[in-house]
Amino acid sequence: GADYISIMQANLKALKKTTEQEGTEIAAEKEEDTKTVQNGYFEDSAVKDRTLSDYAGEWQSVYPYLKDGTLDQVFDYKAKLTGKMTAAEYKDYYDKGYKTDISNINITDKTMEFVVDGKSKKYTYKYVGKHTLTYSKGNRGVRFMFEATDADAGEYKYVQFSDHNIAPTKAAHFHIFYGGESQEALFNELENWPTYYPSKLTGQEIAQEMLAH
C-alpha cells in the first residue's frame, strides 16, 4: 500500500517528462506504440472488429471504491502529476464518470448479465460494428457496439464498450455505455462512462492498477 504509493510519488518528476497526456490515463511505462493507441492516437487502418469474448469474465464497478475513499490516492496522484485539477476536482469528475447502479457485469462470448441491487438481467448479444469518436483535445476513441437479440432487453438493448484498445485483445478493464434508444444516441454520452475491473480484484488492487496505467 503506502510503499507502492510513495514509490509512485517519487516517480512524479520522471513521469512528467515522459508523458504529455491529460490525466485520464498515465501510460508512461507502456511500449511506445501501445501508449499511443491507449492515449487515442492511431491510424484508421489499425482499427479491427472485435467479439464479445474480448470482454468475457466477471466484472465489478469501481464506483463503490470512489464512494468509500479507496480511490482518493489516485485522485491525489493525478492532481500532483498534472496540476490541471485539484484532487477534489478529479474526484468530482470521476464521480460523474463512474456513476452507475450496475454493481457487476458477467460476460460470456454471447451473453451479458447485469446485476443491480442483487437482481440480475441476462441477455444474448450480437456484434454490430465499431465507431470511432474524435474528442475535443484531438485524440480518438473506438466504441465496439453490441445489440441484444432479446425483444425485452429494454435499456440494455444497445451496448458499447471502450477499453482504450482498437483491435482484438482481452480487456483489462472497460467503460460501458448502454441504452434502449439507439447506438447513435450513445455516441453523445461523454460524461458518464461506468467503469469495470475484474471482480477478483480488491479496491486497493484496482487503485494500484489505475496508478500504474
State what each model feature region is.
Residues 53, 58-64, 104-107, 113:
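Beta-strand cores of secreted/periplasmic/IMS beta-sandwich domains, seen most often
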Residues 15-23, 56, 63-70, 97-98:
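Sec/Tat-exported extracytoplasmic proteins
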Residues 42-58:
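N-terminal helix-cap/turn-to-beta initiation motif at the start of protein domains
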Residues 30-45, 107-213:
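Calycin-type beta-barrel ligand-binding domains and close structural analogs
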Residues 4, 55, 125-127:
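Aromatic side chains
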Residues 1-2, 66, 166:
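Solvent-exposed loop/turn segments at secondary-structure junctions
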